[in-house]
Amino acid sequence: MPEKGKPMDIHDTNGTLPDRGPTTSAFRGPDRIRRVACLGTGLIGGGFVALFLARGLDVIVWDPAPDAKDRLDQILTTAWTTLERLGARAEDRGTLSWASTAEEAVKTADFVQESAPERLELKRNLYASIELVTPPDVVIATSTSGFSIADLQAGGSQSTRVIVGHPFNPPYLIPLVEVAGAVHTSREALIAAEAFYQSIGKVVIRMDHEIPGFIANHLQAALEREAMHLVAEGHATPQQIDAAVVHGLAPRWSAIGPCMVRHMGSSAGGIGGYFERFNLGSERSLSHHTPPEFTPEFIKAMSEGCRTMEAGRDKATLSAARDRAVIETLLAQRHAGVSRHGV
C-alpha cells in the first residue's frame, strides 16, 4: 500500500504520463494538498469524496440538501467496498467533516472540487460566494460536464485559477479526468491541477481549450446516438446493443482505442492508407448526426429492454456488480502493461 495521501498503483500508467514540468509555486502542488473542499455530494461529488478519503486526504464537505449526509453515507459505503478491493486501508483513510456554508468549506482548503447540480445560475452564485474567500494559491476545479468556465464566471470574477476537472462516473473507480480552462485561465493552475489529479492515481487529459462535453462525452454521445437509432428503426434491441458493446467493442477498447483499432486493422499504410482509400459514402450510411425522435414506441422499447437487463436488481446491486467487473478490467490492464494510450 502506498504511503498516506499517495496513489494506489491500480491506475499506474507505467511511467508514460507526459512530463508537463514542475508544478509552479503560484498554486499549491500535491505535496501541499492535505485538505480538499468538496462542494456537492451527488454521484460525482460523493464519488470524489470517496476517492480523496481513500488517498488519505482530509475532506471538508458542503451540501445544503436535507438528505445530503444520508446520501453521502450510502455512496461511501458502496465506494469503500470497491476501494478496499483496490488496496485502500481503513487506517490510511482521511477524515471527513462538514461545513455549514460553502465559504466555510473553502477557506481552509488546499484544493476545491465543485460538483454542485448542473444548474447555471446556482453555480454562478456559488462561484461568486467562494472565490473571494478561497486562499489565492488554491485551484478551484469544477466537475461540470455541460458548462464552460466562461459560463460559470459570466458577470462575475474572471479568476484565472478556476479550471475544469471533469471525471468519468464513478470518480473513485474510473481513472480518467479531463482538465481544461478558458482563454484567461492560468496555465500554472492547469498544471497544478493535473499534477494533483495524477498524484491521486488519475489518468489526466489536459485539453488545449474547452469544448462542450470535452472529449470522452463526445465519443460516448456518438455511440449512444447510433444505439438509439438502431432501436428506433427496429434493427436491434437494447439487449443486443449492450451485448455488442460488452462482448465486442469494450474488450478491445480496454487495450487500444478506436484510432489504433483502425490503424491496426488497415491492410496497407495504416490509418493513413485507410483514409487515402476511404469511401465517404459507405461511412455516411452508418452514421446519424442527430438522435431519433423519442416516440412512445421508442421509449417503450428502450425501457422494456433495460428492465429486462436489470433482471429485478436494484441500482445498488447493479452498481456493485459493475464495480466488480471494472476492478477486474483495471487489474487486467495493469497486468497486461496497458499504459496511458493503450498497449
Pin down the residues of each PLM region.
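NAD(P)-dependent Rossmann-like dehydrogenase/reductase catalytic/cofactor-binding core
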Residues: 2-31, 55, 202, 233, ...
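Internal alpha-helical scaffold of NAD(P)-dependent oxidoreductase catalytic cores
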Residues: 55-57, 179-210, 221-252
